[in-house]
Amino acid sequence: MVKIRLARGGAKKKPFYLIVATDSRKRRDSGYYIERLGYFNPVAHGQEVRLTIEKDRFAYWTSKGAQISDRVKQLVKEFKDPSIYEKRVAT
């Protein structure tokens, strides 16, 4: 099963997360993921971008049945576009 979740990166005490589509059986920080969908920088200051999501790829994976983690759902709402994680019917 494919999941959309966060993968931690960055240095000690300076977290940085990738939003990735990955196999649910893999560990969070294994380095293995199918596709990078964006990133989240929780310690962004000033003009730094805090959150970036590729909407079209996110929509593609959710339409294929990927499960979304709770934290990523919260981030999508913060991104102010909750429609991108709604289930879409493949045509």
UniProtKB/Swiss-Prot annotation:
Superkingdom of the source species: Bacteria
Transmembrane intervals: none
Entry keyword annotation includes Repeat: no
Keywords assigned: Ribonucleoprotein, Ribosomal protein
One family name in Pfam for this protein: Ribosomal_S16
Gene Ontology biological-process annotations: translation
Molecular function terms, GO-annotated: structural constituent of ribosome
SUPFAM superfamilies reported for this sequence: Ribosomal protein S16 (SSF54565)
Gene Ontology CC annotation, any one: small ribosomal subunit
UniProt similarity note: Belongs to the bacterial ribosomal protein bS16 family.
PANTHER family documented for this protein: 30S RIBOSOMAL PROTEIN S16 (PTHR12919), SMALL RIBOSOMAL SUBUNIT PROTEIN BS16M (PTHR12919:SF20)
Cross-referenced NCBIfam families: S16
Name this polypeptide is given: Small ribosomal subunit protein bS16
Record organism: Ruthia magnifica subsp. Calyptogena magnifica
